[in-house]
Amino acid sequence: MTKTFIFGHKNPDTDAISSALIMADFEQQTGNTEAKAYRLGEISAETQFALDHFNVEAPELLNEDLKGQDVILVDHNEFQQSADTISNATIKHVIDHHRISNFETAGPLYYRAEPVGCSATILYKMYKERGFEIKPEIAGLMISAIISDSLLFKSPTCTKEDVDAAQALKDIANVDLEAYGLEMLKAGASTTDKSAETLVNMDAKSFNMGDYVTRIAQVNTVDIDEVLDRKEEFEKVMLEMSANEKYDLFVLVVTDIINSDSKILVVGAEKDKVGEAFKVQLDDGMAFLSGVVSRKKQVVPQITEVLTQ
């Protein structure tokens, strides 16, 4: 049987890592014994907390050339967010909950995208549809991914399906959703021991928006001001990366996971467009965005709209 590489996006978050592991288990249950989960970056503190809690080993870092290899993408589809050699791979499946952009294949494939808050929610539905066993550790990974992507069900991306899935899984995983979720999110919200470069790259994605390449990074915290006390450090890293990677715009979204608000820091020639997108005036490259927590639903569409007019 041909080996199948399963992975989420670069700079993986908890959903990207968890969904790769879950999908590998799903494929194993279909009889694909050569399916294996990989990762495209370092494990975050939040994700490591989840892996440790449910005694799951992190996926191996993908270093292989994917030319001619069978792959399954989870939690992403855009090629600039995927493995460097993805254009040479044979994409067999995609399981995702994001927009579809910069994606094409030479042949047909199984593509499942749903407007839910988390890829793991789709995978939960797939297990139920096939009558597959959901082991406690798989249930735990599903819950962790849902809580992470929905910020403990507070994000506007969160749907009833996400909540229902987590509720159905909590007894299998033997966790209290509120207590476990808050502990996991706080584990990932510590920033004082991380460099500016690490924080800017920890959860960052690139997007093609019309004629512009935009980089949007997000940092979760319990104290926005503490993070942005290091504004000059962040700006230096963001400007250097923009020059090296040819980003037209770089946006750092610092999100308060307790109060569900964010502040943004923006660099780039088109930064005034970001103020226009949110109908705010940038002050020294920064602005407060009340109620904004979701990059996918509350940041990317708004900036895309002003950059493609």
Curated annotation (Swiss-Prot):
> Residues that bind Mn(2+) 2, according to the entry?
D15, D75, H97, D149
Q: What Gene Ontology cellular component terms go with this record? A: cytoplasm
Q: How is the cofactor bound?
A: Binds 2 manganese ions per subunit.
User: Which Enzyme Commission number(s) are on file for it?
Assistant: 3.6.1.1
Signal peptide stretch: none
Record's keyword terms, sorted: Cytoplasm, Hydrolase, Manganese, Metal-binding
Answer whether the UniProt record assigns the keyword Amino-acid biosynthesis to this protein: no
Query: Which cofactors are reported in the record for this sequence?
Result: Mn(2+)
Recorded GO molecular functions are: inorganic diphosphate phosphatase activity; manganese ion binding
Q: Which reaction does it catalyse?
A: diphosphate + H2O = 2 phosphate + H(+)
Q: Specify the protein name.
A: Probable manganese-dependent inorganic pyrophosphatase
Under Pfam families, the record lists: DHH, DHHA2
Tell me the protein family, please: Belongs to the PPase class C family.
- Quote the record's binding site residues for Mn(2+) 1: H9, D13, D75
Q: Where in the cell is it found?
A: Cytoplasm
Its gene is ppaC
Organism name: Staphylococcus epidermidis (strain ATCC 35984 / DSM 28319 / BCRC 17069 / CCUG 31568 / BM 3577 / RP62A)
